[in-house]
């Protein structure tokens, strides 16, 4: 599994890459910050090019994205890590919502699920072919509150010959009237409008994460990432594995979500 981050917080930029080998449990994480810099994002996902780098010397992380009509080419370079990805964008539905906290504070978020991806990861000179997989884009803009906690989970795959994906979130949207939850089936997004109930124990490395309505995910691996820079702090618990359960579509049809590969997380942030 490969995770990439390009973030602009007005007063600094962050670029990060995370690689997990689910078979061996090996993890590689690189992250860099660049004070007083803002990455230049396009107005819409899938439009234009992105060039971002943060960190200095051997700690620099560089991420480049080039988009055409239906494909994104991604290149990442960091100490001991090189990533090359080709992501197809099928043009299916994606959940996009604005979460309001006040008249001046809000966050727009878009989750683009179940995008076919191929590519390779090179670690310390050894190249690993990733084969065929799934990519998720998490794109957001807005004005966050200084201290925020969120849950986020997603999974993609093919079940009974049908391409399906799951998107679930919580905590940061509670009480706002907005949710970012839904089930994607063969290109159509079915919205889950209610707040979801998350049950998990971050101190139990063998325990499952359960989400009411969508199902549950036994983890194959846990990642804990923490950054503490004075007023800036991030601590994220992530669980990687396979989702099991069912979901109900707009017309009342119950569908299986068994076998969707993805993750669930809790993240506490001070920005």
Spans of model-derived segments:
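Structured soluble/peripheral alpha/beta segments that form catalytic or ligand/cofactor-binding pockets
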Residues: 1-271
